[in-house]
Each structure stands twice: as C-alpha cells, then as structure tokens.
C-alpha cells in the first residue's frame, strides 16, 4: 500500500514531543482540560481522527491544499498532546475559517480545543461562530471563563450574548466583571430589543475640536485597540457630536491641520429608539460603514457598524422569505441542517393548515358550478392552468411590492400609482398569455384531438378571456394587499404568497365559470 506523502510541516508535527498544557490557562480551566484529555478521551479522539480522515479522503479542497488546517489534523494535535503547535496553527487561521472548523467538531472536542486557544484567537473565533455553537460553549463555561470571554469581546457582541442567557447567570457574570464593563453592558441591555440602542457599541475613537491631525493620530493610537472601528473618528464636545473625520482625510492632511478644518459637520444620525431595520436601511442608503447614535436628549452615545447592519438585513430578509413561503419565523433557528426536524415541521404546519382550510372556498365555488362539469367536462381540464397562471402572476407583483415596501421604494400612499401601473402591465401580460393560450387550444383540439370535441373556438374564447381577466385580477390583488397590510400596520409579507394564492384561485374560478355560462348558455 502506497504511503501517504508528508509535508515538512506534518513531519515536524510527528516529531514534536508531548507538551504540557500552556501555563497562561487559568488553573481551574487547566484542571478541566486535564480531565477531558485523559487516556479514555485520547482513545475516543483517535476514533474521531479516523472518522475525520475518511470524510476528508474525497474532499477536493483538502486534496488541493495539503497545508490546510483540517478537522483530522486538529484532532491529531490533541491526540499527540502538541498544544503549542495547535496554538501556532490556529493562530495562522482567519477567525471566520477557524470558527467554521470548530463548528465541525463535536461538542466535547470543540470545548477542549477552544480552551487551548490563545485568548485573542479564541475571542475572535467566538464572534464568528453560530448561535448554536456559542450556546454550547457558554453552557459548558465556568463563571471565570464566561467573565473572561465577556471582558475580551466587543461590548455590542457581549450584550447580544448576555441577552439570551438566564437572568441569574447574567447577574453573576456582571457582578464579577469590571465596573466599566458592567456599567456599559447594563446600559446596552436596558435598550428595547431590535432598537438602535441594542445594536450599538460605545467603543469608538473620540476626538476634540481643538486637536490637530497629529493629535488625532495620537488619539487613534491610544483608543484604537479597543475601538470598534478606526476608519471613522468622531469629534465630540460635552457629549455632543460636532462632526466626523474619516481616516482618509487624516492621512491626506498635513499633521498641523486643525481637525475642525477637515471634519464633516453635516452628520447623519439615528436615535437609540429607532428600529434596527430602519438604521440598517439608512446605512445602506448613505453607504456608511458606521452610523452615529444619539439619545433622546441629543447626546452622542455610540455607533452602529456595518457588520451589525448586514446581520439585521439578513435576518429581516430571511424572516420575510419565511412569511412569504407560509413558514412561521423562528428567532432561535440557525441553518437548515442546524434546525431540528420537529422545529421545521412546527414552523410549517400552522400556515399550511390555515391555507388548507381556506381552500374550502375554492371547493365551494367548484361545487356551485357542478352542473357545468356534467354538461361540458372539458372545462375541468383547463382549471389547473388557469389557477396556476393567475397565482403566479399574483406572486410576481406581491414579491415586488414586499421588496419595495421593505426598501422604502414604495409607500401605501402610492396606492393609485401602483393601481394605474399594474392595470397597464396586467393588460399587456393578460393579452399576450390569452392570445397564446387561445392559439394553443385551437391547434391542440382541432388537430391533436380532431373530431373529439365540438365548438373548439368557443372553448378557446372562454379560457383565453378568463385568463386575461384573471391575470388582471391577480396583479391587482397581489399589488394592493401588501400596501393595505402596511397601511393597517400588519406585515406585508404575510399578505404575499399564502393569502393571495387562495383569493386569486377562488376569484379566477368564479370568472371562468361565469364567462363559460355566457358563451355556452344553451349547453349548460
């Protein structure tokens, strides 16, 4: 059997002796690690290594990158107790990549590796991990570890983490945290959920009006390590925001230039009570990487950075998509595979039950026109096409309206504008679909089913005219319902696909049979 080629780095790992646990790890954590890395655990790790190697054997990315840090390589370092080497290789990884790798490990191995990481590396990786993986770690942490993690995290991330913890745990952690951290976190935790205040961080670079560019650079060096961003600095006097200065402006200015000469005093701000989605849209609108936040008295209290804004937009988009697909949104849901089968079912069943019961109206319409089926059974074959086409047309415009309302491109006050535009659009779409469908029916039943059906032209006219008016109806219903929902304070996404399909189906059938009765009056 051909022996696997070893890279110089892998050979070095094989040659390294067993190493003691790093001395900078707190004694309590060292004790836990010693228990987790006993002989039995090492045997279990060896089995995990073998399974990981099987998984990676057919991974093209691993084959193309022999130096890549993989799950099996990480576990091998644990088995061989090469803790210093483990720290070195993890330190070279991007925090996001390391977080992804840690999530591939089972809960016990993830905890062991995380405890072995250097403090700054662990903190950075922790910020990129999924909520589920972070919760697993937090539940296993001692109070000492949890306080240490909170102290090292940015304040907004720490506040987000504490929000999901039991009140008793939060109280213990805050009591053991430094006074400055405790006061800052208490302020953030007191802001309403989903508000700008709950999203912001008070960690920013603060400048004064009397500074020069040279003084500003000195201030950045002092404050920058703990600041959320150094790309934008804030000129503040008596807790009131006077202006902003970009790093670009500072770099391109003479060191002796006064800050007031280069700062922008026309600053766009938001209030702590503003909705987080509104803040994210404003940042998107102005192309900001950070947004200043003021309290109700106009005092400058913090900033919201672009990474948090992106998270908000992603969450809101996901929630809208779930509602439009008749799925109940779940704040605790993670990824598709990270969500349990029961949770998936629980999210989908309620709306599906409502829609199934609402289909009773469609059934009642069909039953009412039962005599038409007996007289002209061919009418039944066109019903699926008619309802599907009308439903698709309604879904098209409702999706555009929900998006437009979310982005602020459309307002409920634009009701008449939307109505006029959709009347014209639907007339064109309905005419094209009606003509093509009429031609299809005529050719199909004249030649393919020649002699089997009478009055083919009559059927073509009934279906095409019904389709024309159904498309117009669907476009109007799909466009108007989200606007009406927004006006009434309801969520427009709820009025999208689920309700529109049901309404349009029933109305399309009524139109269809009424037109059929008019054309085939003597036959029904």
Predicted regions and their residues:
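Membrane-interface segments at loop-to-transmembrane junctions
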Residues: 338-347, 411-426, 457, 461, ...
